[in-house]
Amino acid sequence: MICAVYKSRRKVDSYLFVEKRNVFERVPDALMKMFGEPDLVMMLPLMKRDHLGFADINKVKSELAEKGYYLQLPPPKVNLLEQHKLEIGYSRD
């Protein structure tokens, strides 16, 4: 299985995996509007891979088969100040 990977012009670090290059029929219209004009990043062969950088390869494969697309969103940003406060036990109360 080879899929096409597109990055979003609107959402930083958001990627859309689709079954075929320039085929977005199975992607919901609302998602395409939110994603914006897709920029092709690469054609990615999935059959010989056992992992991807930030996505679960098995989830990517299953969602491509079931839905025709997989949306990879960036991990949530960590508030380092709040994390540090928790680590040192700081509380306003």
Curated annotation (Swiss-Prot):
It comes from the Bacteria. InterPro entries: YcgL-like_sf (IPR038068), YcgL_dom (IPR027354). Coiled coil: none annotated. Residues 1-85 form the YcgL domain. This is YcgL domain-containing protein Ssed_2518.
